[in-house]
Amino acid sequence: MKIRFFSDAYKPKRASHRLRGEVTARALADQGYDAKILTNDWSEVDANTIVIFLKRSQPDSIQRAKDLGAKTVYDLCDNKFEEKEEYEPCCQLADLVSVNSVQMGVSTKHHTGRDSIVMPDPFERPKLESTFNPGREIKLLWFGSQSSFKFLPVVEIWQRLEKEIGNYKYTMISAKTDRLISKMSLRQAKGQVSGINFDKLDMQEWTWERQGQLLSECDIVLMPVQTDNPRTDTKSANRLIDSLMSGKFVITTALASYEEFAPYTWQEDYIAGIKWALAHPGKALERIREGQKYTEEKYSARVLSKQFIDEVIKQLGTKNA
């Protein structure tokens, strides 16, 4: 049985394609499966193939695979049914639907009537030594896609850090961060916002390598999330687990996919979390270590990919050959 991962707009830089495509395919291949990314050469797609359609796949491509006799899985990881017109027809056309979280499955069922199987995102960062030994200036880090800024109370965070913490450096890494800092600087100059110390903010352009370097250097990953948007509660825990695997204390917000990590992170008021960690460095370090252990056992690409493909084969009634 051949396993192929495909998107009509495949980009390894895109987290969903990297985690749910490249990383998962590699983990399956390492376990002896014939699994890889499908490019424009469809000559090997036949009745002995499962094609997993990732983000930005289109109905025509799913139909093409079905016409060639392949079994099809449509993978969803963004709750954008109101925006993405291809979501519903892709769900209806595919033999099976997979999602990144239980809550994403609830949304998929609501919008399409289709049941789904859950495959959480695996961690992709190498395991680093757990550390928590801040200096006088605490080094904070946020990372995420450009769209993630929509779910971040950024002005409030900047204001509260300056007012309630004082000695900090907050590095934020994403796409087009210069636009955000320019916009906010202008707003403060016009008196529309106040209390932001831009000298303590370090906005950097994202690369996979730079994110890894900054994770190794920071003290705390600070990533609160606004919960009043229906998209937030369907997200996976990929940023949280990569931060834990990088050996860092994580301060965030209680989301459905984060609940199981509550013993290893801080999911209440973020300023209180920073102060608690600074006052209890030994306890913070213990949370990181236990969180790493839990994540390594439950969220490796090897474990998740095997669980996923076993369930796919079971649901589709195919046999691995």
Residue ranges and their predicted role:
Residues F149-K150, D202-L214, V221-D242, T252-A262:
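Nucleotide-sugar-dependent
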Residues P126, A279-I313:
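A charged, aromatic-enriched C-terminal amphipathic alpha-helix characteristic of glycosyltransferases
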